[in-house]
Amino acid sequence: MTIEPDDDIVLQVSDLEVTFEGRAVLSDLSFSVARGEILTILGPNGAGKTVLLRSLLGIVPYHGSITWEPGLRIGYVPQRLPYIRNMPLSVADFFGFKSGSTGDVPVMLDTVGLPPELAGNLIGDLSSGQFQRVLIAWALAGDPHLLLFDEPTAGVDVRGTETVYALLSRLYQERNLTMLVVTHDLAVVHRLSSMVLCLNRKPVCHGPPLSVLTPENLQRLYGTEVRFYEHGHE
């Protein structure tokens, strides 16, 4: 399958299957992503959500087809980079690792609500919330059309979580981005997402959150009763 540049679809996944050592980690997975969509990928630990993102990036082998719109620029915000935090690197040094991102680091930091002087700080001295915003700024440095987020608030406290999700909402509006967001945070799904993919090694549901996040589907997804506890996002 090919995707034309003027199509509304920027990503088409068909019959995706990933196996590790003969065990199916993902199977029977087909979905598409439209331009401007925010797709939340929801599921329990071990559901294959991170494997899906890595498959989309071509990092892990897979069967089936993954088709991106030609020329689409993609940014990726991983769940954790602990080894980076243990290295004696400044924020500016970290940006220097990325080809094409050696420009004005303070401006990039300002984009994600961080003070420009933070460029000289060591990565290891940042709070979890600050580091997560640095990763987002790093992903934005290549001026992407689409961003992939793997648990963008993992290890971040409640206040930092609110800040990160408010930032994602603002960036989406200001930059006309398409986003794929892996999260465990049910409370933000209705506020942030236009579509949700419920995944537990196989697709459980896919569609608008208000339509598909029923008690029955959530029980199928998690194997227990799940209730929403809403955060307040500005």
Q: For each predicted feature, which ranges?
A:
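The feature captures the beta-strand-to-loop junction immediately N-terminal to the Walker
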Residues: 42-44
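Conserved ABC ATPase "signature" region
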Residues: 103-118
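H-loop/switch region of ABC-family ATPase nucleotide-binding domains
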Residues: 183-184
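Conserved switch/coupling elements of ABC/ABC-like ATPase nucleotide-binding domains
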Residues: 201-211
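Conserved catalytic motifs of ABC-family nucleotide-binding domains
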Residues: 143
